[in-house]
C-alpha cells in the first residue's frame, strides 16, 4: 500500500478531536510514533504483544495483552488501526472514571453478553497475575487468582447471581477504591496492595 503519510488527514483529525481527549498536536505526535512502530498503519495481535511485553519485562504479559488487544479492536477485524488505538488510549489514560470502568468491563466480559462471570473474571485475573506477580506482593486474601476473584465477587455481586452486571461493576468500583486497585494491574501501584 505504499508509504503512509505521517500527517493525519483533516477529516480524521477532526473525528479524533471529537472522540478523544487529545489535542491536535498530541494526535499528530501519536500518529507519527504509531507509524514509526507500525509502518503499515495497523497492528496485529503478535506485534501488540511484543510492544506490551516492554511495559511488563518481569512477567508474562502475552495473555493479558490479548485481552487488551481484543478490547482495542472495536471492529473485531483482528487488527488495531490508529483510530482504534488512540480512542482506547484516550479512555484509559484521560477518560473519566466511569469511562475507564466501562472500558474495563468490556475487557472482562469475554463473551460480550453484558455480564462478567466468575470464569471470565478468573481468566483476566490469572493473566494479570502472570504479568505482575513476580514484582507484586499480594495480601493473603488475594494470594491466588481464585482468592482475588472471590474477593471481587463478594464485594461487587450485590444480587448474588454469580455474575456482574455493568451497573454492579461500576457501583462496586465507585463505592470502594480498594476494588479499583483489585482490578488494576499496574506494578507501580504495588505499594497500594
Curated annotation (Swiss-Prot):
A Pfam family that the UniProt record links to this protein: EF-hand_7
One example of the protein's molecular function in GO is:
kinase binding
Q: Per UniProt, where does Ca(2+) 1 bind?
A: 73, 75, 77, 79, 84
Q: Where is the lipid attached (N-myristoyl glycine)?
A: 2
Annotated GO biological processes are:
calcium-mediated signaling; cellular response to calcium ion; cellular response to electrical stimulus; cellular response to L-glutamate; inner ear development; positive regulation of protein targeting to membrane; regulation of postsynaptic neurotransmitter receptor internalization; regulation of signal transduction
A single GO cellular-component term on record: neuronal cell body membrane
Q: How is it modified after translation?
A: Myristoylation facilitates association with membranes.
Q: Where along the chain is Ca(2+) 3 bound?
A: 157, 159, 161, 163, 168
Instruction: Give the way it sits in the membrane.
Output: Peripheral membrane protein
Tell me where it resides: Cytoplasm, Cytosol; Membrane
Q: Which CDD domains does this UniProt record tie to the protein?
A: EFh
Known PROSITE patterns for this protein?
A: EF_HAND_1 (PS00018), EF_HAND_2 (PS50222)
Family annotation (InterPro entries): EF-hand-dom_pair, EF_Hand_1_Ca_BS, EF_hand_dom, Recoverin
Where would you say this protein principally sits, based on its record? cytoplasm
* Superkingdom, taxonomy of origin: Eukaryota
Reported tissue expression: Brain specific.
Q: What does it do?
A: Calcium-binding protein that may play a role in the regulation of voltage-dependent calcium channels. May also play a role in cyclic-nucleotide-mediated signaling through the regulation of adenylate and guanylate cyclases.
Tell me its family: Belongs to the recoverin family.
Disease in which the protein is involved = Dystonia 2, torsion, autosomal recessive: A form of torsion dystonia, a disease defined by the presence of sustained involuntary muscle contractions, often leading to abnormal postures. 'Torsion' refers to the twisting nature of body movements, often affecting the trunk. DYT2 is a slowly progressive form that first affects distal limbs and later involves the neck, orofacial, and craniocervical regions.
Name of the protein described by the UniProt record: Neuron-specific calcium-binding protein hippocalcin
Amino acid at each position: 500500500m505504499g508509504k503512509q503519510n505521517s500527517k493525519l488527514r483533516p477529516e480524521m483529525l477532526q473525528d479524533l478531536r471529537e472522540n478523544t481527549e487529545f489535542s491536535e498536536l498530541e494526535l499528530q505526535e501519536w500518529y507519527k510514533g504509531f507509524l514509526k512502530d507500525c509502518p503499515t498503519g495497523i497492528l496485529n495481535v503478535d506485534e501488540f504483544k511484543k510492544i506490551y511485553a516492554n511495559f511488563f519485562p518481569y512477567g508474562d504479559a502475552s495473555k493479558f495483552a490479548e485481552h487488551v488487544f481484543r478490547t482495542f479492536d472495536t471492529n473485531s477485524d483482528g487488527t488495531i488501526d490508529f483510530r482504534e488505538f488512540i480512542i482506547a488510549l484516550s479512555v484509559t489514560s484521560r477518560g473519566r472514571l466511569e469511562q475507564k470502568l466501562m472500558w474495563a468491563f468490556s475487557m472482562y466480559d469475554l463473551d460480550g453478553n453484558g455480564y462478567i462471570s466468575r470464569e471470565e473474571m478468573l481468566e483476566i485475573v490469572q493473566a494479570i497475575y502472570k504479568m505482575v506477580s513476580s514484582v507484586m506482593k499480594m495480601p493473603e486474601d488475594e494470594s491466588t487468582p481464585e482468592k482475588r476473584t472471590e474477593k471481587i465477587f463478594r464485594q461487587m455481586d450485590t444480587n448474588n447471581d454469580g455474575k456482574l452486571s455493568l451497573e454492579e461493576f461500576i457501583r462496586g468500583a465507585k463505592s470502594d477504591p480498594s476494588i479499583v486497585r483489585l482490578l488494576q494491574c499496574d506494578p507501580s501501584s504495588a505499594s497500594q496492595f
